[in-house]
């Protein structure tokens, strides 16, 4: 009996059942789809790193040393795998363009950091001048297999032929300036050569300046410190601080909040619409359920007779939610991977997000149906048999006067909203949530642009020159004078480790600044600049260690250990850097009176002279870093646009569903209006007035809601990447509100067309469900 009743109820619902299933599946499916996309991106990245053996620790030295002792040192430290490489900074010359380059001399059969060849062939011992190029650089300049290019290394120019293109786990998202967590795709020409070939071409036979290892327990801890001790280290990079890994972790950490936020927004409004729809269904069966109670059926049977059709709707909605999860997940994962230059995304079927989407859809449906059914089952059978009380639709006098502001059709539409406050409120909340979420994404993009522009605008340098080896301050100053720089500022940088009193530990890049830096200006959010015994931390490092101003820290470098106090916290895109006075930093790094980097203020000619100087390894410009940031944001805007389209699509579904449910409830009224002579224009005005009124109220509500949604998102971005603040601007909202109004008019036109197709006589006589 219950099964027959459920089947009959579903058939009677018709279009309403389809709309309820769509609403059930859309919200949870969209939220779970973003979770699935994050899972796919992480799985793709981790699978790539695992397959091509990304080392868990990399030591870059300031000068080449004999390779044999380095390998023996790694074995003594307990390394499971180890390889030495020769990595030289220089410039790639191709088609009149000069690009910062790293020549990587590596074993042909490398145990670590293997190459994933995407075109052509890999390295070969017999091809001494056959180079394998990083794919991003080759794509940027249109270089193909068989082309020729030149590398300028340590004053020598070497002619090479491109043997193949590849991606490396170490150089995934390679960038010329890794200080900033903004990838400049193609800005660094990574050229892979057989190690013996590069050693021979540069006169450094048997030498290496890079040691990559896999240590038990990862790349941090006592073994790593023992391996590093006494070496002239320029950079220490454990796997967790590898550039590509840090960037994707920051993105995944930032985007991971979208899933719960979208799930919360769509879940609330979806539950409202589901609850209202099923409440109408239960109320329409009041007499029928009362009869079951009167003839002796227990209340649990009455509740079951309602839950059974609801469960059928929920099961269909759960299946739709799973399908939406897969579709949204793959769409977002592909957009993200395209934006950051990842390899092709792999799609393992993650059960978690699918089960979450289906479970939420089914649970929301059953909960929405159980509450009105439970209330009805507690009624006295005689009271239930009397049917639903006829409510009065008469509005208070002041509301009647307020709504009588236009033609009768518009008045009818406005009063229709007020006569059904629950349905109208649910619609307004759902549309406001969809608009607010899309606007919040716009706010984040504009705020990020503003914050990064402000960060670079506050700096006085135009170019940064990394030196091939540390130079005395006087020689570094002479180098910039020869280049014709208007102003120059020498700095010293090197790897260090900070330990907090609470046990926190992190690797940093220690930078030494002049007493009054003119070119590198710190944007201090609290405290003061570097001073003896007082270190300035980036906001990211302070959060990672959980320290605040005045906290005591232990600073360890290859030259020793010292105690420092957190004297300032700076907002910076160079999240790995911490700052001390230059003299103190140079002593701690074992480089007293020397510089490793020179910041200059000058034009492109100055940069060209610096690039041509053999003492300079690499030159990067502030303008190129800013351009790269804008390009990245432009590409990520494509991902944001996908999320906005999804948000607006779900909002449009809610709007269309609400108008359709309202239309189904009021077919008799529309038929009566048509019988009284109302035509397309009058009925269309009534429906459009109702739809636009709801959308305009929702648009007004979406403004504070958008800021409210953007706030935790910006905080999450600050934790992972960079403190951007919030800069809400009118375009962020108008770009979403205007399409929402257009969608409202389209939905109203559809409802009007259906109203005009009604059979007037049959509709007026019919007994409608709900």
Q: What are the residue ranges of the model-derived segments?
A:
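Short cytosolic juxtamembrane segments of multi-pass membrane proteins
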Residues: 378-395, 756-770
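Short, membrane-interfacial amphipathic segments enriched in basic
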Residues: 1-4, 237, 395-411
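Juxtamembrane segments of multi-pass membrane proteins
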Residues: 50-66, 407-532, 536-540, 548-551, ...
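Membrane transport/envelope proteins' first extracytoplasmic loop
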Residues: 2-268, 280-283, 299-300, 330, ...
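C-terminal transmembrane helical bundles of large multi-pass transporters
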Residues: 490-491, 595-601, 609-715, 719-726, ...
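Interfacial "coupling" helices/loops that link adjacent transmembrane helices in transporter permeases
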Residues: 13, 248, 272-312, 653-696
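Short, strongly hydrophobic transmembrane alpha-helices
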Residues: 14-40, 311, 319, 422-447
């Amino acid at each position: 009996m219950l099964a027959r009743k459920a089947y009959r109820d579903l058939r009677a619902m018709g279009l309403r059942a389809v709309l309820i299933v769509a609403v059930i599946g859309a919200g949870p499916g969209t939220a779970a789809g973003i979770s699935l996309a994050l899972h796919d991106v992480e799985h793709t990245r981790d699978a790539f790193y695992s397959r091509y053996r990304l080392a868990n620790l990399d030591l870059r030295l300031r000068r080449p040393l004999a390779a044999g002792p380095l390998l023996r040192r790694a074995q003594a430290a307990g390394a499971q795998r180890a390889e030495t490489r020769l990595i030289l900074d220089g410039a790639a010359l191709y088609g009149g363009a000069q690009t910062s380059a790293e020549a990587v001399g590596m074993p042909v059969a490398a145990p670590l950091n293997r190459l994933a060849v995407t075109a052509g062939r890999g390295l070969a011992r017999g091809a001494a001048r056959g180079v394998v190029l990083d794919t991003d650089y080759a794509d940027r300049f249109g270089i193909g297999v068989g082309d020729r290019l030149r590398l300028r290394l340590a004053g020598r120019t070497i002619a090479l032929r491109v043997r193949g293109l590849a991606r490396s786990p170490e150089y995934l998202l390679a960038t010329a300036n890794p200080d900033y967590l903004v990838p400049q795709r193609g800005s660094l020409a990574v050229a892979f050569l057989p190690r013996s070939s590069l050693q021979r071409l540069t006169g450094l036979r048997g030498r290496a300046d890079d040691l990559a290892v896999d240590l038990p327990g990862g790349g941090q801890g006592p073994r790593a410190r023992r391996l590093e001790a006494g070496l002239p280290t320029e950079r220490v990079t454990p796997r967790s601080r590898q550039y590509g890994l840090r960037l994707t972790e920051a993105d995944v950490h930032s985007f991971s909040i979208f899933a719960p936020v979208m799930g919360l927004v769509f879940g609330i409004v979806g539950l409202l619409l589901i609850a209202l729809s099923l409440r109408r269904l239960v109320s329409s069966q009041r007499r029928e359920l009362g009869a079951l109670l009167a003839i002796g059926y227990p209340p649990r049977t009455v509740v079951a007779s309602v839950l059974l059709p609801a469960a059928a709707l929920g099961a269909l909605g759960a299946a739709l939610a799973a399908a939406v999860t897969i579709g949204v997940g793959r769409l977002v994962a592909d957009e993200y991977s395209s934006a950051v230059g990842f390899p092709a995304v792999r799609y393992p079927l993650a059960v978690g997000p699918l089960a979450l989407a289906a479970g939420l859809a089914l649970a929301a449906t059953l909960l929405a149906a159980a509450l009105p059914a439970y209330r009805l089952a507690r009624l006295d059978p005689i009271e239930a048999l009397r049917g639903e009380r006829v409510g009065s639709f008469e509005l208070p006098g002041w509301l009647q006067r307020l709504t009588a502001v236009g033609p009768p059709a518009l008045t009818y539409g406005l009063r229709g909203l007020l006569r059904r406050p629950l349905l109208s409120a649910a619609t307004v909340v759902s549309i406001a949530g969809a608009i607010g979420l899309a606007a919040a994404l716009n706010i984040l993009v504009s705020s990020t642009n503003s914050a990064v522009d402000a960060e670079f605008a506050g700096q006085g340098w135009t170019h940064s020159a990394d030196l091939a080896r540390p130079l005395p301050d006087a020689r570094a100053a002479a180098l910039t004078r020869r280049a014709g720089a208007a102003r120059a500022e020498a700095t010293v940088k090197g790897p260090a480790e900070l330990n907090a009193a609470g046990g926190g530990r992190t690797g940093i890049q220690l930078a030494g600044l002049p007493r009054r830096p003119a070119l590198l200006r710190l944007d201090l959010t609290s405290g003061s600049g570097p001073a003896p015994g007082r270190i300035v931390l980036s906001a990211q490092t302070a959060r990672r260690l959980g320290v605040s101003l005045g906290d005591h820290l232990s600073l360890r470098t290859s030259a020793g250990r010292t105690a420092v106090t957190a004297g300032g916290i700076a907002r910076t895109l160079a999240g790995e850097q911490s700052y001390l006075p230059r003299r103190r930093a140079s002593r701690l790094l074992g480089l007293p009176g020397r510089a490793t980097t020179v910041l200059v203020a000058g034009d492109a000619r100055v940069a060209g002279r610096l690039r041509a100087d053999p003492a300079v390894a690499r030159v990067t410009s502030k303008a190129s870093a800013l351009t790269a940031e804008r390009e990245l944001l432009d590409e990520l805007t494509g991902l944001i646009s996908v999320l906005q389209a999804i948000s607006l699509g779900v909002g449009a579904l809610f709007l269309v569903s609400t108008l359709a449910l309202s239309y189904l409830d009021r077919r008799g009224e529309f038929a009566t209006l048509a019988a009284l002579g109302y035509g397309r224009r009058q009925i269309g005005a009534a429906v459009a007035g109702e739809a636009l009124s709801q959308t305009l109220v929702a648009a007004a509500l979406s403004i504070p809601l958008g800021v409210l949604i953007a706030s935790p998102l910006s905080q999450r971005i600050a934790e992972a990447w960079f403190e951007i603040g919030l800069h809400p601007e009118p375009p962020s909202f108008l770009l979403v509100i205007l399409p929402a109004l257009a969608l409202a008019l389209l939905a109203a036109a559809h409802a009007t067309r259906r109203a005009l197709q009604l059979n007037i006589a049959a509709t007026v006589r019919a007994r409608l469900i709900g």
